């Protein structure tokens, strides 16, 4: 019960409620009543354990299966209903975003298929009065354990969906399928997903949740090379420019709402996170623009400037960030090599890119070794 109470207030802080106090109160009461029911059920089950066990062992197979199927169906329905209530009682636009993510999550679909198929089979067995041998119960126990494993995966997956950093990551990861969106709620085009990311981070900024903002930006930094719209989409330059403008706007909002908050010494790290993210996005954007011009000298000049300024960038004194940047450089090298092999990139341009990127990678690796030696001393 106490666990449900803590979870309730955590959810209240995460979401921007619709303004109707009644909805918020209804949801809180829903969780409170549910926690009381679960608590009472557990107490009653423990007190009457012997009676329940005797009833199960002395009854027929069909009634056992009906009982187990009913219990599993109840648990599944509760999990789905709780997640549905959490999504529906958030703000309208955030509700669309969460629903879009959730119904496309493989773990959610797997849970629905396995859980409700199991319940259907148990009830079907009970209705047909199938008598099983004792050895067959071993299989049934494994099936029940599989369902409880699915419950755990379901809860973990949903916790990720309502966590801003995972929500942002999931939205950006999805492959762009073109500008055929039927509306904001579909989030099927890159522009809609970029705006959804903006809204999620903006809401965290407005409530002063510095920690969540930093986590979102760090997640974007880490997985940037996995976002289709920025790496492989034909309009990636446009999306990179759009995202850079979004980050700039969010940074202004962050300065206004978070930087001068009392008891927030952590807030300055948010500006550092913005700076690091903008650098990564700007690097990808600039190199794509230079390649499009097919100007080898311009490409060399940009990468050489980055090479010469590695020691001057304060952000590269952060070992973790430098490792992320090296990872991005290696991914870019692989990407351009693949494009060259597919005749999408001139070999001459690729060779220049390869030389400059390898030099930059070596420079960063030297910087990493330098930082490691400083830490050891």
From Swiss-Prot:
Sequence intervals crossing the membrane: 26-46, 67-87, 108-128, 135-155
Compartments, record wording: Cell membrane
Membrane topology classification: Multi-pass membrane protein
GO terms for cellular component: plasma membrane
Keywords: Cell membrane, Membrane, Transmembrane, Transmembrane helix
Name of this chain's protein: Uncharacterized protein MJ0704
Organism: Methanocaldococcus jannaschii (strain ATCC 43067 / DSM 2661 / JAL-1 / JCM 10045 / NBRC 100440)
